[in-house]
Amino acid sequence: MGASLVGNEVAPQRRDLRLAIAGDLHDQWDQSDEDLLLALAPDGLLVVGDLSNGHARIPRSLARLSLPLACVLGNHDSGRDPSGEALRRQLALLGERHCGWGLRELRPPGLAVVGARPATAGGGYKLSDAMRSVYGPVELQDSVERICAAARGADPSLPLVLLAHCGPAGLGSEAGDPCGRDWKVPPCDWGDQDLALAIERIRRERALPLVVFGHMHHRLRRSGGERTTFVRDRRGTMYLNTACVPRHGVDHLGRALRHLSWVELTSSGEVRRVAHRWYGLDGSLLYEQLLWPQPRP
């Protein structure tokens, strides 16, 4: 019937949450992106980092958005500044929107976002000089515990999403795998070890439907091929690499394109749709790569 009766009133049916996800920005964020989000009106925006090379423009722009937002900074956001000042400046601008090593509950729409280690460059576990300057020495197990503690603090009634700059180790060791090293031979698994360990611990206590990350660009550097950007493991967790770089483009008809990844999930955490999308500046959906449900051959 589409709705359930409670007494004499009809309880409204809760619609799916619609999340827009901006992959590695690398300075490609401007007024057209803000206008696009106004046109699309998603329930929330997730940003996986590498906003620029340590500049304040994009963090300041993100902080102005009225849209519910969660962000984790990437390795480029340190700006090659070992003192950590560039990182601190952006953290201050983003404020509570930055959820690295922490929890950000978006109410509305009703989503718990746990941030992984910020400013990671992948490759197992390593803290940059900038990270040490800002956070002090943090060992691998300490990082795991920070991520898990944030997840334990999340409202259990909300669906949980892990937001990371680099994805976890364990998704494959070939260059074209979601976190495979593609810029140097031999290829190897370049995912984050602390994130992989945290995922295993979190899933002992609650469901984890989705892990969102970037860092490993979709276009492979050596072969020019395309990376696998979506994996669903045997326990049902989905891993989405959103790093379409460059995310501003032009199609063969001369139309300007803006890339966003798109996820739709229920309030109980069931993921209904995962896609990479390219929009026109007017908000029209011009191209879509559907990742889930997997299209039939």
Language-model segments: residues:
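N-terminal active-site segment of His-dependent metallophosphoesterases
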Residues: 1-70, 78-86, 296
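Active-site-proximal beta-strand elements of phosphoester/diester hydrolases
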Residues: 16-26, 110-124, 161-165, 237-244, ...
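Active-site neighborhood of phospho(di)ester-bond hydrolases with catalytic His/Asp-centered motifs
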Residues: 21-24, 45-50, 69-75, 98-101, ...
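Binuclear metal-dependent phosphoesterase catalytic core
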Residues: 2, 7-15, 104-107, 201, ...
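Active-site-proximal segments of metal-dependent phosphoesterases and phosphodiesterases across multiple
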Residues: 11-14, 157-207
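Binuclear metal-dependent hydrolase catalytic cores centered on His/Asp/Glu-rich metal-binding motifs
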Residues: 108-159, 185-191
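Active-site environment of divalent metal-dependent phosphoester hydrolases
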Residues: 26-32, 52-57, 76-83, 105, ...
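Glycine/small-residue-rich loop that forms an oxyanion/phosphate-binding "nest" at active or ligand-binding sites
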Residues: 81-104
